[in-house]
Amino acid sequence: MQQAIEQTATGGALRFNGICKVFPGVKALSDISFEARPGSVHALMGENGAGKSTLLKILGGSYQPNSGTLQIGEHSYQFKSTAESIAAGVAVIHQELHLVPEMTVAENLLLGHMPNRFGLINRGAMYRRAGELLKGLADEIDPRTRLGDLSLGQRQLVEIAKAMSRNAHVIAFDEPTSSLSAREIDRLMAIIVRLRDEGRVILYVSHRMEEIFRVCDAVTVFKDGRFVKTFEQMADLDHDRLVTCMVGRDIQDIYNYRPRQHQGPSLRVTGLLGLGLQEPVSFAVQKGEVLGFFGLVGAGRTELFRILSGLTRSTAGSLQLDGQPLTLKSPRDAIAAGVLLCPEDRKKEGIVPLSSVAENINIGARPRHVNLGCLIQGGWERDNARAQIKSMNVKTPSPEQQIMFLSGGNQQKAILGRWLSMPMKVLLLDEPTRGIDVGAKSEIYEIIHTLAADGIAVIVVSSDLMEVMGISDRILVMSEGAITGELNRDEADESRLLQLALPRTRG
Protein backbone atom coordinates (compact mmCIF):
# COMPACT_ATOMS: atom_id res chain seq x y z
CA MET A 1 0.00 0.00 0.00
CA GLN A 2 2.65 2.53 1.08
CA GLN A 3 4.77 1.61 -1.94
CA ALA A 4 1.83 2.37 -4.20
CA ILE A 5 1.35 5.72 -2.48
CA GLU A 6 4.99 6.65 -2.91
CA GLN A 7 4.69 6.00 -6.66
CA THR A 8 2.31 9.04 -6.86
CA ALA A 9 -0.42 8.65 -9.43
CA THR A 10 0.39 10.70 -12.53
CA GLY A 11 -2.44 9.62 -14.80
CA GLY A 12 -5.59 7.62 -15.21
CA ALA A 13 -9.16 7.94 -14.04
CA LEU A 14 -10.36 8.42 -10.47
CA ARG A 15 -12.77 5.68 -9.37
CA PHE A 16 -14.83 5.40 -6.21
CA ASN A 17 -15.66 1.76 -5.55
CA GLY A 18 -18.45 0.98 -3.05
CA ILE A 19 -17.60 3.80 -0.63
CA CYS A 20 -19.59 3.68 2.62
CA LYS A 21 -19.23 5.99 5.62
CA VAL A 22 -21.19 5.71 8.86
CA PHE A 23 -21.22 8.20 11.73
CA PRO A 24 -23.00 7.43 15.02
CA GLY A 25 -26.65 7.13 14.06
CA VAL A 26 -26.12 8.42 10.50
CA LYS A 27 -25.18 6.66 7.27
CA ALA A 28 -23.47 9.54 5.44
CA LEU A 29 -22.50 7.57 2.31
CA SER A 30 -23.98 4.34 1.03
CA ASP A 31 -22.19 2.28 -1.66
CA ILE A 32 -20.92 5.21 -3.76
CA SER A 33 -19.42 4.07 -7.06
CA PHE A 34 -18.59 6.24 -10.08
CA GLU A 35 -15.67 7.33 -12.25
CA ALA A 36 -14.18 10.74 -13.08
CA ARG A 37 -12.05 10.79 -16.22
CA PRO A 38 -8.70 12.53 -16.70
CA GLY A 39 -8.94 15.66 -18.82
CA SER A 40 -12.44 16.48 -17.54
CA VAL A 41 -14.14 18.66 -14.93
CA HIS A 42 -16.59 16.45 -13.03
CA ALA A 43 -19.25 18.16 -10.90
CA LEU A 44 -20.63 16.67 -7.69
CA MET A 45 -24.17 17.94 -7.13
CA GLY A 46 -26.74 17.47 -4.40
CA GLU A 47 -28.51 19.21 -1.54
CA ASN A 48 -26.79 19.91 1.78
CA GLY A 49 -26.39 16.57 3.51
CA ALA A 50 -26.25 14.67 0.21
CA GLY A 51 -22.72 13.44 0.99
CA LYS A 52 -20.54 15.58 -1.28
CA SER A 53 -18.32 17.04 1.45
CA THR A 54 -17.98 13.67 3.19
CA LEU A 55 -16.78 12.11 -0.06
CA LEU A 56 -14.21 14.89 -0.56
CA LYS A 57 -12.94 14.39 3.00
CA ILE A 58 -12.48 10.69 2.27
CA LEU A 59 -10.65 11.59 -0.94
CA GLY A 60 -8.44 14.00 1.02
CA GLY A 61 -7.69 11.49 3.79
CA SER A 62 -9.51 13.43 6.56
CA TYR A 63 -12.12 10.66 6.91
CA GLN A 64 -11.63 6.93 6.45
CA PRO A 65 -14.46 4.94 4.81
CA ASN A 66 -16.05 2.03 6.63
CA SER A 67 -15.80 0.09 3.38
CA GLY A 68 -14.84 0.64 -0.23
CA THR A 69 -11.71 1.87 -2.00
CA LEU A 70 -10.45 4.65 -4.23
CA GLN A 71 -8.59 3.95 -7.43
CA ILE A 72 -6.34 6.37 -9.32
CA GLY A 73 -5.09 4.85 -12.52
CA GLU A 74 -3.98 1.32 -11.66
CA HIS A 75 -3.48 1.92 -7.93
CA SER A 76 -6.10 1.28 -5.22
CA TYR A 77 -6.13 3.28 -1.99
CA GLN A 78 -7.83 3.59 1.36
CA PHE A 79 -6.14 6.68 2.76
CA LYS A 80 -5.41 6.72 6.48
CA SER A 81 -4.27 10.37 6.54
CA THR A 82 -4.07 13.55 4.50
CA ALA A 83 -0.36 12.86 4.00
CA GLU A 84 -1.18 9.61 2.18
CA SER A 85 -3.71 11.41 -0.01
CA ILE A 86 -1.20 14.13 -0.93
CA ALA A 87 1.47 11.52 -1.68
CA ALA A 88 -0.95 9.79 -4.07
CA GLY A 89 -1.32 12.97 -6.11
CA VAL A 90 -4.57 14.31 -4.61
CA ALA A 91 -5.27 17.93 -3.64
CA VAL A 92 -8.54 19.07 -2.07
CA ILE A 93 -9.05 22.84 -2.11
CA HIS A 94 -11.62 23.54 0.58
CA GLN A 95 -13.92 26.53 0.94
CA GLU A 96 -11.93 27.43 4.07
CA LEU A 97 -8.38 27.49 2.73
CA HIS A 98 -5.73 25.50 4.58
CA LEU A 99 -3.04 28.17 4.58
CA VAL A 100 -1.23 30.16 7.29
CA PRO A 101 -2.06 33.89 7.05
CA GLU A 102 0.93 34.98 9.18
CA MET A 103 3.48 33.31 6.88
CA THR A 104 4.71 34.55 3.51
CA VAL A 105 3.37 33.21 0.24
CA ALA A 106 6.63 31.34 -0.36
CA GLU A 107 6.58 29.76 3.11
CA ASN A 108 3.01 28.57 2.54
CA LEU A 109 3.85 27.12 -0.87
CA LEU A 110 6.90 25.20 0.31
CA LEU A 111 5.85 24.38 3.88
CA GLY A 112 7.29 20.98 4.76
CA HIS A 113 9.86 20.94 1.97
CA MET A 114 11.66 24.27 2.13
CA PRO A 115 15.14 24.35 0.53
CA ASN A 116 17.91 24.53 3.11
CA ARG A 117 21.63 25.06 3.22
CA PHE A 118 23.84 23.97 6.12
CA GLY A 119 20.69 23.24 8.13
CA LEU A 120 19.20 26.71 7.60
CA ILE A 121 16.36 27.73 5.28
CA ASN A 122 17.78 28.99 1.98
CA ARG A 123 15.42 31.93 1.53
CA GLY A 124 16.82 32.96 -1.84
CA ALA A 125 16.15 29.49 -3.26
CA MET A 126 12.75 29.42 -1.54
CA TYR A 127 11.63 32.68 -3.16
CA ARG A 128 12.94 31.59 -6.58
CA ARG A 129 11.09 28.27 -6.38
CA ALA A 130 7.89 29.99 -5.21
CA GLY A 131 8.14 32.45 -8.10
CA GLU A 132 8.41 29.54 -10.54
CA LEU A 133 5.27 27.94 -9.08
CA LEU A 134 3.30 31.19 -9.37
CA LYS A 135 4.47 31.93 -12.93
CA GLY A 136 1.59 31.89 -15.38
CA LEU A 137 -0.86 31.38 -12.53
CA ALA A 138 -0.51 34.50 -10.40
CA ASP A 139 2.42 36.51 -11.74
CA GLU A 140 1.37 39.62 -9.80
CA ILE A 141 1.88 37.94 -6.40
CA ASP A 142 5.25 38.59 -4.73
CA PRO A 143 6.40 35.40 -2.94
CA ARG A 144 7.67 37.60 -0.07
CA THR A 145 4.19 38.99 0.63
CA ARG A 146 2.46 37.99 3.85
CA LEU A 147 -0.38 35.67 2.84
CA GLY A 148 -2.92 37.48 5.04
CA ASP A 149 -2.40 40.65 2.96
CA LEU A 150 -3.72 38.98 -0.21
CA SER A 151 -7.33 38.97 -1.40
CA LEU A 152 -9.31 35.77 -0.98
CA GLY A 153 -9.07 35.12 -4.73
CA GLN A 154 -5.27 35.49 -4.63
CA ARG A 155 -5.02 33.16 -1.62
CA GLN A 156 -6.99 30.59 -3.57
CA LEU A 157 -4.45 30.85 -6.40
CA VAL A 158 -1.69 30.18 -3.87
CA GLU A 159 -3.56 27.04 -2.77
CA ILE A 160 -3.78 25.91 -6.41
CA ALA A 161 -0.07 26.61 -6.94
CA LYS A 162 0.65 24.53 -3.83
CA ALA A 163 -1.32 21.63 -5.31
CA MET A 164 0.61 21.92 -8.56
CA SER A 165 3.93 21.99 -6.66
CA ARG A 166 3.05 18.49 -5.43
CA ASN A 167 2.25 17.33 -8.97
CA ALA A 168 -1.37 16.67 -8.03
CA HIS A 169 -3.19 14.65 -10.67
CA VAL A 170 -6.58 14.84 -8.91
CA ILE A 171 -7.70 18.31 -7.77
CA ALA A 172 -11.04 18.75 -5.98
CA PHE A 173 -12.62 22.20 -5.55
CA ASP A 174 -15.22 22.61 -2.76
CA GLU A 175 -17.41 25.71 -3.31
CA PRO A 176 -14.42 27.65 -4.69
CA THR A 177 -16.30 30.80 -5.78
CA SER A 178 -18.45 31.42 -2.69
CA SER A 179 -16.55 34.59 -1.70
CA LEU A 180 -14.96 35.65 -5.00
CA SER A 181 -15.66 38.69 -7.17
CA ALA A 182 -16.88 38.25 -10.76
CA ARG A 183 -13.37 38.97 -12.09
CA GLU A 184 -11.80 36.44 -9.71
CA ILE A 185 -14.39 33.84 -10.76
CA ASP A 186 -13.52 34.38 -14.44
CA ARG A 187 -9.85 33.90 -13.64
CA LEU A 188 -10.50 30.74 -11.63
CA MET A 189 -12.63 29.27 -14.44
CA ALA A 190 -9.78 29.85 -16.91
CA ILE A 191 -7.30 28.14 -14.56
CA ILE A 192 -9.61 25.14 -14.08
CA VAL A 193 -9.91 24.75 -17.85
CA ARG A 194 -6.11 24.89 -18.10
CA LEU A 195 -5.71 22.21 -15.41
CA ARG A 196 -8.28 20.06 -17.23
CA ASP A 197 -6.47 20.46 -20.54
CA GLU A 198 -3.25 19.27 -18.87
CA GLY A 199 -4.99 15.92 -18.33
CA ARG A 200 -5.80 16.19 -14.63
CA VAL A 201 -8.97 14.90 -12.98
CA ILE A 202 -10.94 17.87 -11.64
CA LEU A 203 -13.81 17.42 -9.16
CA TYR A 204 -16.01 20.49 -8.72
CA VAL A 205 -18.60 21.11 -5.97
CA SER A 206 -20.81 24.19 -6.26
CA HIS A 207 -24.42 25.26 -5.66
CA ARG A 208 -24.14 27.74 -8.53
CA MET A 209 -25.80 26.18 -11.55
CA GLU A 210 -24.32 28.67 -14.01
CA GLU A 211 -20.80 27.55 -13.04
CA ILE A 212 -21.66 23.88 -13.53
CA PHE A 213 -22.86 24.49 -17.08
CA ARG A 214 -19.98 26.88 -17.77
CA VAL A 215 -17.00 24.72 -16.84
CA CYS A 216 -18.02 21.10 -16.20
CA ASP A 217 -17.90 18.16 -18.63
CA ALA A 218 -19.85 15.65 -16.51
CA VAL A 219 -22.08 15.66 -13.41
CA THR A 220 -22.72 13.08 -10.69
CA VAL A 221 -25.78 13.66 -8.50
CA PHE A 222 -26.09 12.53 -4.87
CA LYS A 223 -29.16 12.44 -2.65
CA ASP A 224 -29.25 11.45 1.03
CA GLY A 225 -25.80 9.86 0.85
CA ARG A 226 -26.61 7.74 -2.20
CA PHE A 227 -25.50 7.85 -5.82
CA VAL A 228 -28.37 8.93 -8.09
CA LYS A 229 -26.97 9.32 -11.59
CA THR A 230 -23.94 10.39 -13.62
CA PHE A 231 -24.49 12.54 -16.70
CA GLU A 232 -21.49 11.90 -18.95
CA GLN A 233 -22.41 14.62 -21.45
CA MET A 234 -23.57 18.12 -20.52
CA ALA A 235 -25.51 18.18 -23.78
CA ASP A 236 -27.87 15.63 -22.17
CA LEU A 237 -28.65 18.03 -19.33
CA ASP A 238 -30.41 21.31 -18.63
CA HIS A 239 -31.09 23.31 -15.46
CA ASP A 240 -34.57 21.89 -14.84
CA ARG A 241 -33.54 18.27 -15.36
CA LEU A 242 -30.56 18.64 -13.03
CA VAL A 243 -32.65 20.23 -10.25
CA THR A 244 -35.34 17.57 -10.61
CA CYS A 245 -32.69 14.85 -10.33
CA MET A 246 -31.22 16.48 -7.20
CA VAL A 247 -34.43 17.00 -5.25
CA GLY A 248 -36.64 14.28 -6.68
CA ARG A 249 -39.47 16.54 -7.79
CA ASP A 250 -40.39 18.85 -10.66
CA ILE A 251 -38.74 22.27 -10.92
CA GLN A 252 -42.04 24.15 -10.56
CA ASP A 253 -42.62 22.42 -7.23
CA ILE A 254 -39.36 23.96 -5.94
CA TYR A 255 -40.76 27.50 -6.05
CA ASN A 256 -43.97 26.59 -4.19
CA TYR A 257 -45.83 29.42 -5.93
CA ARG A 258 -49.54 29.82 -5.32
CA PRO A 259 -51.80 32.75 -6.29
CA ARG A 260 -52.97 35.00 -3.47
CA GLN A 261 -55.44 37.82 -2.99
CA HIS A 262 -53.60 41.07 -2.34
CA GLN A 263 -54.89 42.96 0.65
CA GLY A 264 -54.49 46.66 -0.18
CA PRO A 265 -51.59 49.14 -0.36
CA SER A 266 -48.55 48.59 1.84
CA LEU A 267 -45.39 50.50 0.88
CA ARG A 268 -45.43 53.30 -1.71
CA VAL A 269 -42.18 54.83 -3.00
CA THR A 270 -42.36 58.12 -4.90
CA GLY A 271 -39.49 59.87 -6.71
CA LEU A 272 -36.81 58.34 -4.51
CA LEU A 273 -33.20 59.42 -5.09
CA GLY A 274 -30.05 58.58 -3.19
CA LEU A 275 -26.65 56.93 -3.41
CA GLY A 276 -26.67 54.47 -6.34
CA LEU A 277 -29.97 55.71 -7.81
CA GLN A 278 -29.44 57.69 -11.03
CA GLU A 279 -33.11 58.46 -11.76
CA PRO A 280 -36.14 58.93 -9.46
CA VAL A 281 -37.52 55.54 -8.39
CA SER A 282 -41.27 55.09 -7.91
CA PHE A 283 -43.24 51.90 -7.23
CA ALA A 284 -45.79 50.40 -4.84
CA VAL A 285 -46.20 46.97 -3.28
CA GLN A 286 -49.42 45.46 -1.93
CA LYS A 287 -50.01 43.58 1.30
CA GLY A 288 -49.71 39.88 0.47
CA GLU A 289 -47.69 40.50 -2.71
CA VAL A 290 -44.25 39.12 -3.60
CA LEU A 291 -42.56 41.82 -5.68
CA GLY A 292 -39.37 40.77 -7.44
CA PHE A 293 -36.51 43.09 -8.43
CA PHE A 294 -34.23 41.79 -11.18
CA GLY A 295 -31.07 43.38 -12.56
CA LEU A 296 -27.40 42.87 -13.23
CA VAL A 297 -24.59 43.68 -10.78
CA GLY A 298 -24.47 47.43 -10.19
CA ALA A 299 -28.09 48.00 -11.24
CA GLY A 300 -28.92 49.79 -7.98
CA ARG A 301 -31.16 47.19 -6.33
CA THR A 302 -29.06 46.75 -3.18
CA GLU A 303 -28.63 50.54 -2.93
CA LEU A 304 -32.43 50.91 -3.08
CA PHE A 305 -32.80 48.37 -0.27
CA ARG A 306 -30.26 50.27 1.86
CA ILE A 307 -32.44 53.37 1.60
CA LEU A 308 -35.66 51.46 2.33
CA SER A 309 -34.08 49.88 5.43
CA GLY A 310 -32.70 53.16 6.80
CA LEU A 311 -29.04 52.26 6.24
CA THR A 312 -28.62 55.11 3.72
CA ARG A 313 -30.42 58.46 3.64
CA SER A 314 -32.43 59.40 0.54
CA THR A 315 -31.72 62.77 -1.08
CA ALA A 316 -35.19 63.22 -2.58
CA GLY A 317 -38.59 61.56 -2.76
CA SER A 318 -41.02 60.20 -0.20
CA LEU A 319 -42.25 56.96 1.37
CA GLN A 320 -45.69 55.95 2.58
CA LEU A 321 -46.54 52.88 4.66
CA ASP A 322 -50.21 51.92 5.02
CA GLY A 323 -51.12 55.35 3.64
CA GLN A 324 -49.10 57.26 6.25
CA PRO A 325 -45.85 59.20 5.63
CA LEU A 326 -42.73 57.23 6.55
CA THR A 327 -39.43 58.92 7.43
CA LEU A 328 -36.33 56.75 7.78
CA LYS A 329 -33.26 58.27 9.40
CA SER A 330 -31.76 55.00 10.64
CA PRO A 331 -32.31 51.22 10.62
CA ARG A 332 -33.98 51.66 14.02
CA ASP A 333 -36.70 53.76 12.35
CA ALA A 334 -37.27 51.08 9.70
CA ILE A 335 -37.46 48.27 12.27
CA ALA A 336 -39.85 50.28 14.44
CA ALA A 337 -42.09 50.78 11.38
CA GLY A 338 -42.00 47.06 10.55
CA VAL A 339 -39.75 47.35 7.47
CA LEU A 340 -37.17 44.58 7.94
CA LEU A 341 -34.12 43.64 5.85
CA CYS A 342 -32.33 40.33 5.28
CA PRO A 343 -29.07 41.61 3.72
CA GLU A 344 -27.21 40.18 0.73
CA ASP A 345 -24.02 39.39 2.68
CA ARG A 346 -25.50 37.48 5.61
CA LYS A 347 -22.08 36.49 6.98
CA LYS A 348 -20.94 40.12 7.35
CA GLU A 349 -24.23 41.96 7.90
CA GLY A 350 -26.86 39.40 8.88
CA ILE A 351 -25.32 37.24 11.60
CA VAL A 352 -22.94 37.47 14.54
CA PRO A 353 -20.79 34.42 13.65
CA LEU A 354 -19.38 33.67 17.12
CA SER A 355 -22.76 33.96 18.85
CA SER A 356 -25.25 31.14 19.20
CA VAL A 357 -28.24 30.48 16.98
CA ALA A 358 -30.51 31.56 19.86
CA GLU A 359 -28.62 34.83 20.39
CA ASN A 360 -28.76 35.63 16.67
CA ILE A 361 -32.52 35.01 16.55
CA ASN A 362 -33.10 37.23 19.59
CA ILE A 363 -30.90 40.17 18.53
CA GLY A 364 -33.73 42.29 17.15
CA ALA A 365 -36.29 41.35 19.77
CA ARG A 366 -34.09 41.87 22.83
CA PRO A 367 -34.53 45.69 23.21
CA ARG A 368 -38.30 45.25 23.52
CA HIS A 369 -37.92 43.02 26.58
CA VAL A 370 -35.09 44.55 28.61
CA ASN A 371 -37.52 45.91 31.20
CA LEU A 372 -38.98 42.51 32.07
CA GLY A 373 -36.03 41.59 34.27
CA CYS A 374 -33.12 39.29 33.55
CA LEU A 375 -34.85 36.10 34.68
CA ILE A 376 -38.03 36.68 32.69
CA GLN A 377 -36.09 38.00 29.70
CA GLY A 378 -33.84 34.94 29.66
CA GLY A 379 -36.84 32.62 29.75
CA TRP A 380 -38.60 34.50 26.97
CA GLU A 381 -35.49 34.49 24.77
CA ARG A 382 -34.97 30.76 25.27
CA ASP A 383 -38.60 29.98 24.40
CA ASN A 384 -38.62 32.39 21.46
CA ALA A 385 -35.45 30.92 19.97
CA ARG A 386 -36.78 27.38 20.24
CA ALA A 387 -40.10 28.41 18.70
CA GLN A 388 -38.43 30.12 15.73
CA ILE A 389 -35.98 27.24 15.21
CA LYS A 390 -38.97 24.90 15.01
CA SER A 391 -41.08 27.24 12.87
CA MET A 392 -38.26 27.92 10.38
CA ASN A 393 -37.01 24.30 10.44
CA VAL A 394 -33.49 25.47 11.31
CA LYS A 395 -31.27 22.38 11.38
CA THR A 396 -28.98 22.81 14.40
CA PRO A 397 -27.78 20.39 17.11
CA SER A 398 -28.79 22.94 19.75
CA PRO A 399 -29.98 26.56 20.10
CA GLU A 400 -26.58 27.17 21.74
CA GLN A 401 -24.64 26.05 18.63
CA GLN A 402 -22.53 28.89 17.16
CA ILE A 403 -24.35 30.05 14.03
CA MET A 404 -21.10 30.12 12.01
CA PHE A 405 -21.19 26.31 11.91
CA LEU A 406 -24.62 26.16 10.25
CA SER A 407 -25.10 25.89 6.49
CA GLY A 408 -25.98 29.02 4.54
CA GLY A 409 -29.59 27.94 4.24
CA ASN A 410 -29.97 27.41 7.98
CA GLN A 411 -28.28 30.74 8.72
CA GLN A 412 -30.79 32.44 6.42
CA LYS A 413 -33.72 30.70 8.10
CA ALA A 414 -32.42 31.84 11.50
CA ILE A 415 -32.32 35.45 10.25
CA LEU A 416 -35.91 35.11 9.06
CA GLY A 417 -36.81 33.68 12.46
CA ARG A 418 -35.34 36.80 14.05
CA TRP A 419 -37.72 39.05 12.11
CA LEU A 420 -40.71 36.82 12.81
CA SER A 421 -40.17 37.63 16.49
CA MET A 422 -41.03 41.25 15.71
CA PRO A 423 -43.97 43.16 14.18
CA MET A 424 -43.45 43.02 10.41
CA LYS A 425 -45.22 44.81 7.58
CA VAL A 426 -42.62 44.77 4.78
CA LEU A 427 -39.84 42.19 4.36
CA LEU A 428 -36.86 43.11 2.16
CA LEU A 429 -34.90 40.05 0.97
CA ASP A 430 -31.62 40.81 -0.82
CA GLU A 431 -30.37 37.71 -2.72
CA PRO A 432 -32.09 35.43 -0.16
CA THR A 433 -30.86 32.11 -1.61
CA ARG A 434 -27.34 32.96 -2.78
CA GLY A 435 -24.96 30.12 -1.87
CA ILE A 436 -27.80 27.90 -0.63
CA ASP A 437 -28.54 24.38 -1.88
CA VAL A 438 -31.71 23.61 -3.82
CA GLY A 439 -33.54 21.91 -0.95
CA ALA A 440 -32.95 24.85 1.41
CA LYS A 441 -34.00 27.24 -1.35
CA SER A 442 -37.36 25.48 -1.55
CA GLU A 443 -37.81 25.96 2.21
CA ILE A 444 -37.00 29.68 1.90
CA TYR A 445 -39.54 30.02 -0.92
CA GLU A 446 -42.19 28.32 1.21
CA ILE A 447 -41.50 30.79 4.04
CA ILE A 448 -41.81 33.71 1.60
CA HIS A 449 -45.20 32.53 0.34
CA THR A 450 -46.45 31.83 3.87
CA LEU A 451 -45.53 35.37 4.96
CA ALA A 452 -47.24 36.83 1.89
CA ALA A 453 -50.37 34.79 2.63
CA ASP A 454 -50.36 36.37 6.10
CA GLY A 455 -50.49 39.84 4.52
CA ILE A 456 -46.81 40.76 4.61
CA ALA A 457 -45.49 42.71 1.60
CA VAL A 458 -42.37 40.84 0.45
CA ILE A 459 -39.82 42.51 -1.85
CA VAL A 460 -37.13 40.20 -3.23
CA VAL A 461 -33.92 41.23 -5.00
CA SER A 462 -32.46 38.34 -7.01
CA SER A 463 -29.90 37.88 -9.78
CA ASP A 464 -31.34 34.41 -10.47
CA LEU A 465 -33.74 34.72 -13.41
CA MET A 466 -35.49 31.42 -12.72
CA GLU A 467 -35.94 32.35 -9.07
CA VAL A 468 -37.38 35.81 -9.65
CA MET A 469 -39.81 34.44 -12.26
CA GLY A 470 -40.69 31.44 -10.09
CA ILE A 471 -41.67 33.22 -6.87
CA SER A 472 -42.85 36.72 -7.86
CA ASP A 473 -46.35 38.04 -8.51
CA ARG A 474 -44.83 41.01 -10.31
CA ILE A 475 -41.29 41.90 -11.40
CA LEU A 476 -39.54 45.28 -11.63
CA VAL A 477 -36.27 45.46 -13.59
CA MET A 478 -33.44 47.87 -12.75
CA SER A 479 -30.46 48.97 -14.82
CA GLU A 480 -27.88 51.65 -14.04
CA GLY A 481 -29.73 52.96 -11.00
CA ALA A 482 -33.17 53.26 -12.60
CA ILE A 483 -36.31 51.14 -13.06
CA THR A 484 -36.45 50.13 -16.72
CA GLY A 485 -39.52 47.92 -16.80
CA GLU A 486 -42.40 46.23 -15.00
CA LEU A 487 -43.83 42.82 -15.89
CA ASN A 488 -46.62 40.76 -14.37
CA ARG A 489 -45.84 37.13 -13.62
CA ASP A 490 -47.53 35.81 -16.77
CA GLU A 491 -45.70 38.34 -18.99
CA ALA A 492 -42.17 37.61 -17.76
CA ASP A 493 -39.68 35.48 -19.66
CA GLU A 494 -35.89 35.32 -19.66
CA SER A 495 -35.46 37.25 -22.91
CA ARG A 496 -37.64 40.20 -21.87
CA LEU A 497 -36.10 40.46 -18.42
CA LEU A 498 -32.53 40.37 -19.75
CA GLN A 499 -33.33 42.92 -22.43
CA LEU A 500 -34.65 45.32 -19.78
CA ALA A 501 -31.67 44.64 -17.49
CA LEU A 502 -28.93 45.37 -20.04
CA PRO A 503 -27.29 48.82 -19.83
CA ARG A 504 -28.90 51.34 -22.13
CA THR A 505 -27.03 53.22 -24.82
CA ARG A 506 -26.84 56.85 -23.79
CA GLY A 507 -26.73 59.57 -26.37
Swiss-Prot record:
It is found in: Cell inner membrane. ATP binds at G46, E47, N48, G49, A50, G51, K52, S53. Residues 14-249, 249-505 form the ABC transporter domain. It is a peripheral membrane protein. Disulfide bonds: none annotated. It is an enzyme of class 7 (translocase). Signal peptide: none annotated. GO terms for cellular component: plasma membrane. The keyword Zinc does not apply. Belongs to the ABC transporter superfamily. Arabinose importer (TC 3.A.1.2.2) family. The complex is composed of two ATP-binding proteins (AraG), two transmembrane proteins (AraH) and a solute-binding protein (AraF). This is Arabinose import ATP-binding protein AraG. The lineage of its organism: Bacteria, Pseudomonadati, Pseudomonadota, Gammaproteobacteria, Pseudomonadales. The gene is araG.
